[in-house]
Each structure stands twice: as structure tokens, then as C-alpha cells.
């Protein structure tokens, strides 16, 4: 508000660029998320910008008028761009925008100058770094969430060893992914998409239960058959907000209401968790509380790593090849 007040006398058009998304259904106004991660609708409602450019959700919004502010959001991965034009009419600017593909042609420069570097990177990505006792095929999102994921078990094992924590949680990208043997750096970076570092949080049993309840809300029973809840699919696909745990034994009962589905929680060997507090290793992304895990924000941080997970995973595979898959979780889901 202060920025708008300060600059208003000098601006014909005010534009806010925000690394955020839309927390409400832009057609109905229904609240979709209150995590604080997405606040574009609040900005449009409470601040008097002419244009609001967002880019967090990877959700296409070609152009929409919200509370007198023109808002837009391009899709992910630079496949398209938004061309926004304004026309001054009757003392104000009216906007329209079009979504335009970037096309397949490029200029000769800097392409030619950068090509040797690109070639070297591609060769490095394809160098073998180790082997698995068996390749991991691409894992269906629902099946992995219901029955467990070998890929997630591998990532959690890396996190446990690197951090020394008692428990660990990790997530996977939106697309079904596996890991072939021999393993290459390309394979690792495709399997673990994010440049996350590690954080160890001090958590209680109550916090662990809240986190697992959030995971259990991923499922929706339709005629007694588990499906993926639309809250993880709309307004954008968020499979990466379902977490896989290690060091624990837990059971979800999907017949129970969301928020009361965790009916068993113990250590991996079945013994009680104990008094606590406990050390939970997670990503720096999840530690901020994003994705519906707001309670993590209040947890004390015991340790922060500075090496990204793809590099840690490659280091682990190199040091322990051939990789035998750990059994680091007991997960049971009832429906």
C-alpha cells in the first residue's frame, strides 16, 4: 500500500509483478487455499494496481479482471509467453492479452556461442554414476501413494543418512517417474526435479500426526474406491504435496473423515514413538510450511544443509553402488 501511495503521483500505469498465484477460483471466488503461498486475489482486492502479473502456480490465466485489476499468469517452462497490450481510453488504460507459443526457431546468437557448453553438459549428464539392483519403473501417482514408492524410499534414505535425523519425508514430481540402471546424473535430476536442500525440524508427535493427516487428505473415496482428491488437482496439479515418510509405521483409514484418518503411528519397528521431540528431515521447500503444512513453520530448525538433493543422491549412489532398496517405512492404507 505504501509503494502505491508513494508512486501514484508519478505513474500513468502501475504494475505489480508477484511470485504468487490465485488463492481463489477466479470464476466463483471460492477459496481454494489459505496457506499464504498464493495471494493474488487478495492483492487485487486490497491494492489498487492496474496490472498484476503472477507466475507461481504454473496455471494459465490468459487475462482476467479482478476487482478492477487486470491479472494474468503464463504457463510453466517457457513454452508460451503472454503479450499484454494497453489502450488509453477515457482517462484509464484498458488491457488485453494473448498467449503466444515461443516457436521452434531461434537466433544464431547466442545459440552458437553457447552450443559447446550445452554439449559438454549433455555429455556429463549421461555419464554412469552407479547401478541399482533393479531399475525403478515409472510409478503411477495413485498407486505409489497407496502402496509406497521405491523412488521415495531411496530419497528418504539419502536424507536420513545425510542429516542423521530419526524420521524423513520427501515428495515426488507431478509426472510418473522412475530411475533406470545404470544410473546417470540425467536420470537422477529427472527423478528428483527440485533444487531443494535439506532441513531438520524439531517436531512432536502432534506435528507428525498433522502432517500425515495432510497426506491422508490426498485420497477421496468414490463408491468405495480410492481416487485423488480434487484439492490436489485443482486449480493446479499438486502431486508433489503428498509426502512419503521414512522411519515410521503408520496406517490411514480412508473411510474416516479427512482430518481423522491416521489410526496408527509408531516407529518403524512398531515400538511407540516415545515422548519426543523428534528430528524430522525434510526439504527446505516443505519446511516453510507450503503445500498445506503450515504447522512446520513454527517448528525449531535444528540443522540446514547446503547441498542440493540431486547432488546428494548422486553422491550416495556413487558411494554405495550397487544400490539395494531400503525398507524404511511401513505404510498401510485401509478403505
Which residue stretches match the model-derived regions?
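Binuclear metal-dependent hydrolase catalytic cores centered on His/Asp/Glu-rich metal-binding motifs
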Residues: 1-14, 96, 105-108
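Active-site-proximal segments of metal-dependent phosphoesterases and phosphodiesterases across multiple
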Residues: 6-51, 146
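Divalent metal-coordination and catalytic microenvironments
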Residues: 15, 52, 56, 86, ...
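Active-site-proximal beta-strand/loop segments in catalytic clefts of secreted hydrolases
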Residues: 17-21, 55-57, 74-76, 171-173, ...
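Hydrophobic alpha-helical scaffolding
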Residues: 28-33, 107, 111, 141-149, ...
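Active-site-adjacent helix-turn-beta-strand microarchitecture at beta-sheet edges
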Residues: 35-128, 216-220
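Glycine-rich phosphate/diphosphate-binding loops and the adjacent beta-loop-alpha structural elements
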Residues: 127-150
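Feature captures C-terminal
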Residues: 154-157, 162-166, 171-335
